Amino acid sequence: MFLSSGLDFLVATSFSKSFSLYGERVGALSVVCADADEAARVLSQLKIAIRTNYSNPPTHGAQVVATVLTTPALRTMWEEELAGMRLRIKEMRTALVDGLKRAGIPGDLSYITSQVGMFSYSGLNAEQMQRLRSEFGIYGVDTGRICVAAVNRHNLDAVCAAIAAVI
């Protein structure tokens, strides 16, 4: 959309979650500019920002990602594992909605299944999230964001019961 409109743009990509490299801070900044002169100016400014902030980033995570993406067998394995995780998280979203309904939570919970990714905004407020932590040992941030990837068949009922208790 931006490219076809002739707009310059930047895209920040993180590989931390999709490669389970949380402590490595692996990512990329891709920049599209109108011409080579503008690209050179942007690159110059980015180099200044990089030098000021961290100078030499760690390379281990980047090397892992590069190896996986450029080795066909490893890339295929990674893509299959990623697809499996996406499916599991999608199934957990559905199971979470079903469990919350069984726990007596009223209303439309379809927002949980319509969201994508490892996290979901639960609609819980800061006080409710603090109660989940202190009373039930269930952790999320005060904005109500919870990690759906951490929900599984073994803890689903306990999570749903705890959410019902704090509402």
Positions of the model-derived regions?
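Active-site lining segments that contact anionic ligands and/or coordinate catalytic metals
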Residues: 6-7, 24-26, 114-118, 135, ...
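PLP-dependent enzyme catalytic core of the Aspartate aminotransferase-like
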Residues: 5, 98-102, 124-167
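Active-site-proximal segments of catalytic enzyme domains
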Residues: 1
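Conserved PLP-binding catalytic core of the aspartate aminotransferase-like
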Residues: 77-135
